[in-house]
Amino acid sequence: MKIVVLGAAAGGGLPQWNCGCVNCSDARAGRLRPSGQSSLAVSADGSRWSILNASPDIRQQMQDRSVLHPQGLRGSPVASVLVTNGDIDHIAGLLSLREQTPFDLFATAGIHEVLEGNRIFDALARDKVARRPVALESPFALHDGLEAMLFAVPGKVPLFMEGESVDTGLIGEQTVGVRLSDGRNTAYYIPGCAYVPDDLLHRLSDAGHLLFDGTLWDDDEMIRSGTGIKTGRRMGHIPISGPDGSLVRLAGLAADKTYIHINNTNPVWRAGSAERAELARRGWQVAHDGLEIVL
């Protein structure tokens, strides 16, 4: 199995269009590697590929990876797209894939309802793009030789669907993780997770590689930096640090581990930071656009 990180950043990317924080400023100045928004490509054979989350940057992300280029006049090696929630940074890129080339669109019924509720996604011609609802805990083929299974993780509804009160620990079809298997190796992709319950730890025990939500280092990172008014947990993302952060909660896993979906404010972007060094000591790497993982 081969996994290619198309985008390592959280919503907005790095640099974010309206942000002058030190990370964004350094990314603009060439002192820090820019990053597109959260997306993966995965393949069992290096020929047919599936996209996990279609970010707003998907056209450029596919252009940057020759394995995703058309092999003829019209067409694509992309057999399917899977989305793990209804967030803008995971579904907006679907609109760039509307050019009459067939692929399967996998998501839970709940996430498909989000797409059905916005007619702009009717631009994906239904005679070309098959919308395939997937039940939780039910394995299915993303493409030949590559099996996926969706499972619920704690999260919330998309920002544009929030009401006056928001439950950030919902467990259901609105936020899912993905188990990937080629019959020999297993990887997990969880770009959004509000907290790590014990049953999730048990599930991940067979992971060969884990790509996990690395949105914020500190829960109040955006508030302290002056770039936002919400904590990570309010946004449905567990922080990396802290006594019940993901670094502590996932410490016992034997898998190789990669943080992905990283906010522009996160200090782990900086190779020389104390936070990056701490991750390395704990057996984690930080994703970057173009990172290749082979299992």
UniProtKB/Swiss-Prot annotation:
Query: What would be one Pfam family of this protein?
Result: Lactamase_B_2
Indicate whether Ribonucleoprotein appears among the record's keywords: no
Signal peptide annotation: none
Q: Which InterPro entries match?
A: Metallo-B-lactamas, PQQ_synth_PqqB, RibonucZ/Hydroxyglut_hydro
Which GO terms are recorded in the biological process aspect for this UniProt protein? pyrroloquinoline quinone biosynthetic process
NCBIfam families registered for this protein in UniProt? PQQ_syn_pqqB
Q: What does this protein do?
A: May be involved in the transport of PQQ or its precursor to the periplasm, in association with PQQ biosynthesis, but is not absolutely required for this synthesis.
Protein name listed in UniProt: Coenzyme PQQ synthesis protein B
